[in-house]
Amino acid sequence: MNEERIITVFGSSRPAETDADYKEAKELGRRLAEQGFAVCSGGYGGVMEAVSRGAKEAKGKTYGVTAEFFARQANPFIDVEVRMKTWEERLFELIRLADGFVACKGGTGTLVELAVAWEMLNKSVIAGKPMAVVGDFWQPILDRVREVECGARPSSESRVWKEARASLVHSAKTPEEAAKYLALQLEKN
């Protein structure tokens, strides 16, 4: 059985081809494709273009989930464009299609994507979909959430359960580490 596994990558639309964030996302796309994953993104520029480009250069398949809301075309490295009507539909389709997630550096849009996917995992709306962040950009947020979830406040929940919830997002130092982590987690599922 050759079941396609898709990793959705969240990230900023801002990085240009010469930026370090673009290069990191391109490497991530390549590493994911080398692990046998198809790569899904928001389909536009910046990190979305870079991760798709890296995957295509490694002979991987790419998906771009775009929205009529944005007056832009999908980037040229997208094999399959999934066109949604609204921004919200786009967000939930990015999550629905995924077998796992990676968040790269980004702004408020990326923060929302990361937070919604994370909360859906936390509340078991979706299950068995590993999530990673690349680099140290998101680390302060991960640390703060872990502090809130695992703090010393009284709770009927066991500390082990709280720590498991707080650890739903793996912090990967490199694109290679993120791709390997997702492959390992999906092998277990």
Where are these regions (language model features)?
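Glycine-rich beta-alpha loop segments
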Residues: 1-63
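Glycine/threonine-rich flexible loop motifs
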Residues: 18-20, 111-115
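Acidic/glycine-enriched connector segments
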Residues: 23, 46-105, 109
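Glycine-rich, charge-decorated loop segments at or immediately adjacent to ligand/cofactor-binding or catalytic sites
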Residues: 45-50, 138-152
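Short Gly/Thr/Asp-enriched flexible loops that form oxyanion-binding sites at enzyme active sites
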Residues: 50-55, 113-124
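Short, acidic/small-residue loops that bind anionic groups at enzyme active sites
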Residues: 64-68, 104, 120-145, 163-164
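Short, conserved catalytic or adaptor-binding loops enriched in Gly and charged residues
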Residues: 73-76, 148-164
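A charged, well-structured terminal subsegment
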Residues: 100, 156-189
